[in-house]
Amino acid sequence: MVKVGINGFGRIGRVVFRAAQMRPDIEIVGINDLLDAEYMAYSLKYDSTHGRFDGTVEVIKGALVVNGKSIRVTSERDPANLKWDEIGVEVVVESTGLFLTQETAHKHIEAGARRVVMTGPPKDDTPMFVMGVNHTTYKGQPIISNASCTTNCLAPLAKVVNEKYGIVEGLMTTVHATTATQKTVDGPSLKDWRGGRGASQNIIPSSTGAPKAVGKVYPALDGKLTGMAFRVPTPNVSVVDLTVRLEKPATYKDICAAIKAAAEGEMKGILGYTDDEVVSSDFNGVALTSVFDVKAGISLNDHFVKLVSWYDNETGYSHKVLDLILHTSAR
């Protein structure tokens, strides 16, 4: 049993918590957020995207009690004050989006935790790990990142294709669901003017660091991929469009067969495969981080192909945070 603390009970913090309820080998023992316990219970119990929490949620004497288990609740701004050791926390899920460097995340270590997993790309050279891509290279680093949800979708797919046929170069577009950083109506956004436009009214071109991050977790593709994002007015589930030029010739049918073999083999539980007539909402709640859509892709010729893969940018990512915790705890 790995004891886990969560710092930041927003979208990812709460979905990680929900996912952890399905894991008998993970126990959430502490949550830190500036929300009070009553509101924390409310936001866990009711979710507009994922529905009602499947279980009991109460607040008793300031603690969050979920399915009869008491969870310590704190509201500390400085992670150094969290005293994780008092409740036996081994790993902290850093999901505030604020402590994304070695220096700032180390405050959790100072507070008694053994390790930290960031739920987003780091702001420094903190090592990133993606399950199915480079998780086996973990060497005991106390502070790591689970990269981004888009990187977790793109990297497994790109790795399979590159190892089978070789990728000369590629462009990626993620058609990405709305996230909490966006505006409900037009509002100030000085660093990204288009990002300040109303999320429900627009398709918004944006940047993404996912292709560059793939080069870090899978160096064979370093410098070979770049990409962009379109933010679209849907609440959840995103899709990657990966267009690549191949070294070795391959028919689209051959590529699909290679991806299917990986999904049923070494990438099982990470990469999925579907030939159904699916749309985005069909992937809401799917724990896989990348589901290849056979019928959505196309090829121009045996060297130039477009591949499409879906991901629940909340659920799939959160499950891989937990998978990474278990993998790094088993060392």
Swiss-Prot record:
Enzyme Commission numbers on file: 1.2.1.12
Annotated positions for site Activates thiol group during catalysis: H176
Pathway named in the protein's UniProt entry: Carbohydrate degradation; glycolysis; pyruvate from D-glyceraldehyde 3-phosphate: step 1/5
CDD domains xref list: GAPDH_I_C, GAPDH_I_N
Active site positions: C149
GO function terms (MF aspect): glyceraldehyde-3-phosphate dehydrogenase (NAD+) (phosphorylating) activity; NAD binding; NADP binding
Residue sites binding NAD(+) per the record: R11, I12, D33, R77, N313
InterPro entries per record: GlycerAld/Erythrose_P_DH, GlycerAld_3-P_DH_AS, GlycerAld_3-P_DH_cat, GlycerAld_3-P_DH_NAD(P)-bd, Glyceraldehyde-3-P_DH_1, NAD(P)-bd_dom_sf
Any Pfam family hit: Gp_dh_N
CC annotations in GO: cytoplasm
Record key words, sorted: Cytoplasm, Glycolysis, NAD, Oxidoreductase
Substrates-to-products reaction catalysed: D-glyceraldehyde 3-phosphate + phosphate + NAD(+) = (2R)-3-phospho-glyceroyl phosphate + NADH + H(+)
Subunit structure and binding partners: Homotetramer.
Family stated for the protein in its record: Belongs to the glyceraldehyde-3-phosphate dehydrogenase family.
Full protein name: Glyceraldehyde-3-phosphate dehydrogenase, cytosolic
Record gene name: GAPC
